[in-house]
From Swiss-Prot:
Its EC number is 7.1.1.-. The keyword DNA-binding does not apply. InterPro entries: NADH-Q_OxRdtase_suN/2, ND/Mrp_TM. It comes from Acinetobacter baumannii (strain AB0057). It is a multi-pass membrane protein. GO terms for molecular function: NADH dehydrogenase (ubiquinone) activity; NADH:ubiquinone reductase (non-electrogenic) activity; quinone binding. Keywords: Cell inner membrane, Cell membrane, Membrane, NAD, Quinone, Translocase, Transmembrane, Transmembrane helix, Transport, Ubiquinone. It comes from the Bacteria. This is NADH-quinone oxidoreductase subunit N. The keyword Membrane applies. NDH-1 is composed of 14 different subunits. Subunits NuoA, H, J, K, L, M, N constitute the membrane sector of the complex. It catalyses: a quinone + NADH + 5 H(+)(in) = a quinol + NAD(+) + 4 H(+)(out).
Length: 498
């Protein structure tokens, strides 16, 4: 077998190569001389160059979809999701700079781990082969173990890293076993080439078990119930910027890969698997919202909230129309922006190397409005968006998901979205009420007086502005989401039904 790879063959993966090259440059700079500001700036420049390349490709009028070595499919869907991953990663970089500025140990390796994980995440959304599926997933996950436990002097951070390592390794084993069962019956590792063989053997128990194991492994990565137990503990223990990365970039990559896999392999057409996804969606909505009601830790609230939000997202995927696939992308955009803003506010409030700990407890936010009114307004916007209140981006995402469920007559699922949103409104309002209460005489933890003049603060303010703008004028976002098409026969068939 003659297997050669030229530079031109890999050019469609140029954004990934830019990020990988940035990681190499960062490694060299660390070996020459440690300089936190230089390393952080280099990382941000590299991520910006990759994002700029994607924008030029998409809007330059010359973009041509490509199949790279039969392992990766670079289409509008890939580029759109890679851009979202880069935006989320840039937010994490800027938040990390201020967060670990006073960290007494080595700080520079954090950016190296982050860049490696970003490269894996970007490859994930392009994967069209079981081998690239697994390798890119592990390339994203393994650096995350280090990121979560990076501030190991805090016992919570070390615990979060070890807990995620053990449970994630278990999920990876499930994933490999599922792939092995499917390969045994289809004889192909390509999503696209195995469609006919997959449906020919779909009644085989081992094939169904293989598909189920893959879904369970992905459900773990997305922290969907009943595979959610790690989420609140890891979010609460991890450094705030790293929790932001896990909640945004890592999940964007996973949902992007999952959507491509379901459409390219045709697995979404298997009724028994749709039933499993429906059960997972309903459980996630109920478990995430009901457990969040009891929490007094803001990061744990956001952790349980994310479980419910990806339950809503599954409903759009289950609905299986051309418009509903666009609504998945819209919901991901609104969720990422809102989560960046919410976790960003927590990161700005936290300086665990000058103070006692991170600002996690709701008591730390009591009366915040009277000390930091702009930061309070920003966090309020994020809570309203997560709750799905009109004039915020979160409302648009949730409205489109409800429309997708109603259009396909999934009345029960539409009702579950409404019930879940009603429960969620309670704990989001509780966070807002606490911030406007009478402040304590001496707050335990507070944000820097000039937080808005820092890069991280400007990023959080920009996220809040986008949440409001997209809530008032969502048309550009919706149009872009519909154009982010996956190159698959099933997606083409759905587009022709419009």
């Amino acid at each position: 077998m003659n297997f050669t790879v030229s530079f031109s063959t890999l050019m469609p993966l140029a954004p990934v190569m830019i990020v990988a090259l940035t990681a190499v440059v960062v490694m060299l700079l660390i070996s020459i001389k440690r300089n936190h500001n230089l390393i952080a700036t280099t990382s941000v420049v590299g991520l910006n160059l990759a994002a700029l390349y994607i924008l030029l490709e998409l809007f330059g009028g010359k973009f041509v979809p490509a199949n790279v070595m039969g392992m990766f499919m670079v289409d509008p869907f890939t580029m759109f999701y890679q851009f979202m991953i880069l935006v989320a990663s840039l937010a994490c970089c800027t938040l990390s700079h201020a967060y670990i500025e006073t960290y007494k140990d080595n700080r520079e390796e954090l950016y190296l781990l982050l860049l490696a994980s970003v490269a894996g995440a970007m490859l994930m959304v392009a994967s069209s082969h079981y081998a690239s599926f697994f390798i890119s997933l592990e390339l994203m996950s393994i650096p995350v173990y280090g990121l979560l436990a990076y501030t190991y002097q805090r016992s919570q951070s070390l615990e979060a890293g070890i807990k995620y390592l053990v449970l994630s390794a278990t999920a990876s084993a499930m994933l490999l076993m599922g792939m092995a069962y499917i390969y045994a019956y289809t004889g192909s590792l390509s999503f696209y080439d195995s469609v006919q063989a997959l449906f020919g053997a779909i009644k085989q128990p081992m094939v169904l078990l293989g598909l189920a194991l893959i879904i369970f492994a992905v459900a773990f990565k997305l922290s969907l119930a009943p595979f959610h137990k790690w989420t609140p503990d890891v979010y609460a223990g991890a450094p705030a910027p790293m929790a932001t990365f896990l909640a945004t970039a890592a999940k964007v990559a996973t949902i992007g890969l999952f959507v491509r896999y379901l459409l390219a392999s045709g697995a979404i057409m298997v009724n028994s698997l749709v039933t499993v996804l429906t059960i997972i969606a309903v459980l996630s909505i109920l478990v995430g919202n009901l457990l969040a009601v009891r929490q007094v830790n803001l990061k744990r609230i956001l952790g349980y909230s994310s479980i419910a939000h990806f339950g809503y997202l599954l409903i759009a995927l289950i609905s299986m129309t051309y418009a509903s696939l666009g609504s998945v992308t819209v919901y991901v955009v609104t969720y990422v922006l809102t989560t960046i803003g919410a976790f960003g506010a927590v990161a700005l409030m936290s300086s665990p190397y000058n103070n006692v700990d991170e600002a996690q407890s709701l008591a730390d936010y009591r009366g915040l409005f009277w000390r930091r009114p702009v930061l309070t307004a920003t966090l309020t916007v994020m809570m309203l968006s997560l709750a799905g209140i009109p004039l915020t981006a979160g409302f648009i995402g949730k409205f489109l998901v409800v429309m997708a469920a109603v259009t396909t007559q999934h009345w029960f699922l539409a009702a579950m979205i409404i019930v879940g949103s009603g429960i969620g409104l309670y704990y989001y309002l509780r966070v807002m009420v606490v911030m406007y209460m009478t402040p304590p005489e001496t707050p335990r933890i507070d944000a820097d007086a000039h937080w808005g003049q820092k890069v991280g603060g400007l990023m959080v303010l920009a996220a809040a502005a986008l949440v409001i703008i997209l809530g008032v004028y969502p048309d550009p976002m919706i149009n872009l989401a519909l154009k982010a098409e996956i190159l698959s026969p099933l997606h083409f068939m759905l587009s022709q039904q419009q």
